[in-house]
C-alpha cells in the first residue's frame, strides 16, 4: 500500500509540474461546471425566441448575440456543451472499459479466446464506422436515442486500445507475481481484476482522456452532417452547422460554438499528453529524441 501511495504521489507531482496540462484540466473542469451551473442563472433558455433581436451581435442583452430565430447564443452554446461533453465522457468511459476487458481476457488466456477476440477486433477495424453510425443512428431527440448514439460511438472506439492492453497483458502474465498468484490457486478473474488491470491502468487513463476528445469530435461531425442530435435540441455540431452559412455576414453565430469546440479538443489532448508524461516519463524523453 505504501509503494502504491508513493507512486501515486510521484505521478501527481509529475502532472502538476506540467503547467499546460494542469491549465487544460482546470479549463475542462470549468467548462463542464459552467455548462450545467450557468443556464439556470441566465434570463433566456436555449429554446426561447426573441423576435425583437434576430441575428443581433453580442451586447448587454445577449452576451454572445442571437441566431436567425432570435435564440440566445450563450444559452445555446452552454446547452451544446452539455450534450457534447456528456457524450464524450460517456463514450470514453464505456470504450475504455470494453478495451480493458477484451484486451485483458485476450492477453491473459490466449488460445481460442485470443484468436476469436482479435478476429472481432480486426473485423471492426476495417468497418467504415463513421458511415455506419451515420446510417444506423436516428435523428436523436430524446435520451434513449442519445444513449444509442453513445453506445454506437463506444462500440467502434475500443479496438486499438484493446490491442495495446493485450500486448501489455501478455508481457505481464509470465511475471513472477502473476505466476505466484496462479500457483496459490487464485482465480483467473481475481488475477485479471486485482493484478493485470492495475498494471495497465496508466494506458487506460491516457486512453480515456484522449477518447473524450475523439468522441466529442465524432459526435460533432455527425450532428454537423445532419445525424445525431438535431433541433429542437442542440449540440456544438448543430450550432456550427447553423452558423456556417452566415459565417461571413454574422460571424458570431459560427465563431463562438466553433471556438468552444476547439478549446475543448485542445484542452482534452493536452490533458491526455500530461497524463501520459506523468504515468510514463520515458514516452516524453522518446518524443523529445524524435524531435
UniProtKB/Swiss-Prot annotation:
GO biological process annotation, one example: protein transport
Record-given protein name: Oligopeptide transport system permease protein OppC
Gene3D superfamilies (alphabetical): MetI-like (1.10.3720.10)
Pfam families associated with the record: BPD_transp_1 (PF00528), OppC_N (PF12911)
Keyword Nuclease in record: no
Key words, A-Z: Cell inner membrane, Cell membrane, Membrane, Peptide transport, Protein transport, Transmembrane, Transmembrane helix, Transport
Organism: Mycobacterium tuberculosis (strain ATCC 25618 / H37Rv)
Keyword Electron transport: no
Described function: Part of the ABC transporter complex OppABCD involved in the uptake of oligopeptides. Responsible for the translocation of the substrate across the membrane. Glutathione (GSH) uptake by mycobacteria through the OppABCD system contributes to the depletion of the GSH pool in infected macrophages, which impairs the ability of the macrophage to detoxify methylglyoxal (MG) and contributes to enhanced production of inflammatory cytokines.
Family the entry assigns: Belongs to the binding-protein-dependent transport system permease family. OppBC subfamily.
Annotated localization: Cell inner membrane
SUPFAM superfamilies found in the cross-reference section: MetI-like (SSF161098)
Main location: membrane
InterPro entries recorded: BP-dependent_transpt_permease, MetI-like, MetI-like_sf, OppC_N
Superkingdom: Bacteria
Assembly and oligomerization: The complex is composed of an ATP-binding protein (OppD), two transmembrane proteins (OppB and OppC) and a solute-binding protein (OppA).
Membrane topology type: Multi-pass membrane protein
Gene: oppC
Entry's Gene Ontology molecular function annotations: peptidoglycan peptide transmembrane transporter activity
Annotated ABC transmembrane type-1 domain residues: 81-272
Residues that span the membrane, as ranges: 22-42, 85-105, 116-136, 142-162, 209-229, 247-267
Annotated Gene Ontology cellular component terms: plasma membrane
Amino acid at each position: 500500500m505504501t509503494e502504491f501511495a508513493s507512486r501515486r504521489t510521484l505521478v501527481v507531482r509529475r502532472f502538476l509540474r506540467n503547467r499546460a496540462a494542469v491549465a487544460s484540466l482546470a479549463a475542462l473542469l470549468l467548462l463542464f461546471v459552467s455548462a450545467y451551473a450557468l443556464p439556470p442563472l441566465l434570463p433566456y433558455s436555449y429554446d426561447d425566441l426573441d423576435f425583437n433581436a434576430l441575428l443581433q451581435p453580442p451586447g448587454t442583452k445577449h452576451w454572445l448575440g442571437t441566431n436567425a430565430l432570435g435564440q440566445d447564443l450563450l444559452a445555446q452554446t452552454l446547452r451544446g456543451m452539455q450534450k457534447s461533453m456528456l457524450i464524450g465522457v460517456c463514450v470514453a468511459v464505456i470504450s475504455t472499459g470494453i478495451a480493458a476487458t477484451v484486451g485483458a481476457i485476450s492477453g491473459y488466456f490466449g488460445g481460442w479466446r485470443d484468436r476469436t477476440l482479435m478476429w472481432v477486433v480486426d473485423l471492426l477495424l476495417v468497418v467504415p464506422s463513421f458511415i455506419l453510425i451515420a446510417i444506423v443512428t436516428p435523428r436523436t431527440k430524446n435520451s434513449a436515442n442519445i444513449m444509442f448514439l453513445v453506445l454506437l460511438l463506444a462500440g467502434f472506439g475500443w479496438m486499438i486500445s484493446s490491442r495495446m492492453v493485450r500486448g501489455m497483458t501478455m508481457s505481464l502474465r509470465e511475471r513472477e507475481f502473476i505466476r505466484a498468484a496462479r500457483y496459490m490457486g487464485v482465480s483467473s478473474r481475481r488475477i485479471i481484476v486485482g493484478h493485470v488491470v492495475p498494471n495497465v491502468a496508466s494506458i487506460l487513463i491516457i486512453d480515456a482522456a484522449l477518447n473524450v476528445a475523439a468522441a466529442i469530435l465524432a459526435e460533432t461531425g455527425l450532428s454537423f452532417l445532419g445525424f445525431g442530435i438535431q433541433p429542437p435540441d442542440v449540440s456544438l455540431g448543430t450550432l456550427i452547422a447553423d452558423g456556417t452559412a452566415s459565417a461571413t455576414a454574422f460571424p458570431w453565430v459560427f465563431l463562438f460554438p466553433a471556438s468552444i469546440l476547439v478549446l475543448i479538443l485542445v484542452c482534452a489532448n493536452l490533458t491526455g499528453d500530461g497524463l501520459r508524461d506523468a504515468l510514463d516519463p520515458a514516452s516524453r524523453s522518446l518524443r523529445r529524441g524524435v524531435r
